[in-house]
């Protein structure tokens, strides 16, 4: 990841749209390199036709540390922004990169949560898809899904943007919050 730092910094030369799009291309390269280096194979299977010329609200559960690189593999050929928790910006170096590429949400502040929704709508209006984990956090329960927050669904109704559910098969078995990395 640190080898990509100069490329991440390059994205800071541009505005939030172009710079963010560059950042996601770099992250996709990182995802490809990660999967190659670990020997994990990946395949996208669509239940219905996927039109890359349209923007979507992608929704997925978040149950594994492998979910983010998997997202980078799953969403190809279109621009996307992920809704992410603002606390991640406190991580040195990574936090600045994260802030450039994510729509941040402060889950403890209702006003800032509302601003996050407005920011997601802004990107949808710019023809950029958004990725939301409607559980609102990393799922550290024994249940496959936690209760969903309704923000993704309200945004879909308000903007008439289709929701595209994504399922990452076996990521929990490979890199969940309780286990050591396993390639079984």
How does the language model describe each region?
Residues 1-4:
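N-terminal hydrophobic or amphipathic helices/low-complexity stretches enriched
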Residues 8-15, 20-25, 29, 36-38, ...:
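Catalytic core of membrane glycerolipid acyltransferases/transacylases, capturing the structured
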Residues 29, 66, 115, 147-151:
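Short, conserved clusters of charged catalytic residues that mark active-site
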Residues 37-45, 113-114, 171-174:
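Short gly/ser/thr-rich secondary-structure transition/capping motifs
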Residues 47-52, 181-183:
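A short beta-turn/loop motif at secondary-structure boundaries
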Residues 62-64, 135-138:
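Short glycine-rich anion-binding loops that position phosphate/pyrophosphate groups of nucleotides
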Residues 93-96, 125-131, 140-184:
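A cross-family acyltransferase "interaction/gating" segment
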Residues 102-124:
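A membrane-cytosol interface segment of integral membrane proteins
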